[in-house]
């Protein structure tokens, strides 16, 4: 069942499952962006509980990252939890983050989870519309910057490395009229093209298009996929003024931990399915 009705039915009838106990991540290193709260934090906690040797929390605010670190260590004291600053609204910050990652002795898993949902038009300091800058341009740049350590680790270990981009089912729900413009990015930056929630949906479609194109071009045993985390009661919606959203969340939304299960599933399963879009913990064709 597709469309919005199908979405809400699945939210009620499917419950995300945690990783099986036999999934072990011993010795591995992961980077998770947007990891100070919500799904990114929950995914980091779950992977740490499965023996992950090191998790790097990519966060905009270091103090919030340090609080998340302590939360992970309470559960998994043997995990090496590091907090690295990265700002998706600064190309310089993302480049510095990527350069720092080149010094890692290994990088097995990357989950790009940082995102915003701004329903009011706003330009980031880069000059690009904020949803597009953070959700698409920032995510895409980081995926490129982290490819080399992922490839190097796969070559060294003989096992595929994983890059998971957190997308959304809402990517199906946008007409993406900007695609008809001579310059898509320039049109997305114009205020009169902005349609609130539709722009967030478009940014998630751009995630899928980027993931598919990148996956088709990457060699070196790096499996790249995208995941729909589902509707979760997370901080993503904190500035959403939509009437009745709190009521909908109370009825339909999964917990951040359940959304995190979807992320860890995508980052550890379907090793032979590059370019996959995963939803409700299965492969969507």
From Swiss-Prot:
**This protein's UniProt keywords:** NADP, Oxidoreductase
Q: Which residues bind NADP(+)?
A: 39, 64, 87, 200, 204, 234
Keyword rRNA-binding attributed: no
The organism that produces this protein has a lineage beginning with: Eukaryota, Fungi, Dikarya, Ascomycota, Pezizomycotina
What is the name of this protein?
Answer: Short chain dehydrogenase sol3
Q: What class of enzyme is it?
A: oxidoreductase
Function noted in UniProt = Short chain dehydrogenase; part of the gene cluster that mediates the biosynthesis of the phytotoxin solanapyrone, a causal agent of early blight disease of potato and tomato. The prosolanapyrone synthase sol1 is a polyketide synthase that produces the octaketide desmethylprosolanapyrone I via sequential condensations of 7 malonyl-CoA units with one acetyl-CoA unit, and one methylation step. The octaketide backbone is further methylated by the sol2 O-methyltransferase to yield prosolanapyrone I. Prosolanapyrone I is hydroxylated to prosolanapyrone II by the cytochrome P450 monooxygenase sol6.
Gene that produces this protein = sol3
Superkingdom of the source species? Eukaryota
